[in-house]
Amino acid sequence: MEKKPFVTKEQLDEIVKKYPTPFHLYDEKGIRENAEAVKEAFAWNPGFREYFAVKATPNPFILNILKEYDCGCDCSSLTELMLADSQGFDGQHIMFSSNDTPAEEFAFADELGAIINLDDFTHIDFLEQTIGHIPETISCRYNPGGVFKMSNGIMDNPGDAKYGFTHEQIIEGFKILKEKGAKYFGIHAFLASNTVTNEYYPKLARQLFELVVELRDKTGCDIKFINLSGGVGIPYRPDQTPNDIRVIGEGVREAFEEILVPAGLGDISIYSEMGRFMLGPYGCLVTKAIHEKHTYKEYIGVDACAANLMRPAIYGAYHHITVMGKENEPCDHKYDVTGSLCENCDKFAIDRMLPKIDMGDLLVIHDTGA
């Protein structure tokens, strides 16, 4: 797909007169259209809710936009809980999914009435000791171990991840939680990151749906929801094809009808936590070229740095770059696009073919919304 900015050079020229670079810019129209598309894709499930991953974009204005579409908040820290609370999210609209969790964070989540999603078997006793009870509604994060594979070769390694209960632990955990007073249960799993395929959610759903039937049969627990978490990705590179949320939703529905409905579990709600999919393409980092350097390589220095966008510096992530006003010019110059931090990893692009960049040019770094 061709990567085009959602803003024109003329619009940016006006914006920078008021807001100096660098800054993040968001496409409200795109955010709203995407949120509506997600709702429509899962409208077959009456209890569906997207719990937006606050860590992806901890911005109160954006949280309030998503709240208009009945989104909740997926929180993993005290700060995120405080932000969700400050914007009027409460009770069942907050999912607290944390790991290595401090006692005060469990206590605050319980105070807000959030759904607590336990990451570890030992957290059952820790939670009870911390807040003095087990909530009536509780969730557990599942990790099946091994390697998670899909037909297109995309894979991840849950067995090497620090998160979640094992298969044996989640069965035993549900039994213990029920004995301690829990009445309503949920499960959660995140098995692969940024999957650019419509196959991931339906395959994950089948695995979790089968587990839920087993949990119901072996524990007698009343399972109210299944949280498919995140992992639905976006096309950072121009040669990638975007996911189709309608196809994804239909794939999950088919698995639901095949597995849960015949088992008498057709009233279970489906939840998601698609932070990247909800916001990634609808934000960009706008920065200005302020220096050029000609040594062993050609460098363009911009006024943004890794503090504004960490993904490239942390793990070499690709973010497409558009030189505004030069979209139709040939990409015949090879540059490293760098920030000013005293770390050599502070680079937004390495050996990137771009049009000739002049000082003062505005650069749009794509897909920074999450």
Where are these predicted regions, by residue range?
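Active-site loop/helix belt of alpha/beta enzymes
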Residues: 144-290
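Conserved active-site and cofactor/substrate-binding residues in soluble primary-metabolism enzymes
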Residues: 7-10, 26-33, 57, 122, ...
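A charged N-terminal "starter" segment
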Residues: 1-136, 175-183, 214-217, 222, ...
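Charged (often Lys/Glu-rich) extended helix/loop segments that serve as interaction or gating elements
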Residues: 257-261, 265-370
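Short, glycine-/Ser/Thr-/acidic-enriched flexible segments
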Residues: 30, 57, 80, 101, ...
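Conserved, mostly hydrophobic/aromatic
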Residues: 31, 55, 77, 109, ...
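General beta-strand structural signal in soluble alpha/beta enzymes
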Residues: 52, 73-76, 96, 117-120, ...
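Glycine-rich, aromatic-flanked loop segments that form ligand/cofactor-binding clefts
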Residues: 133-147
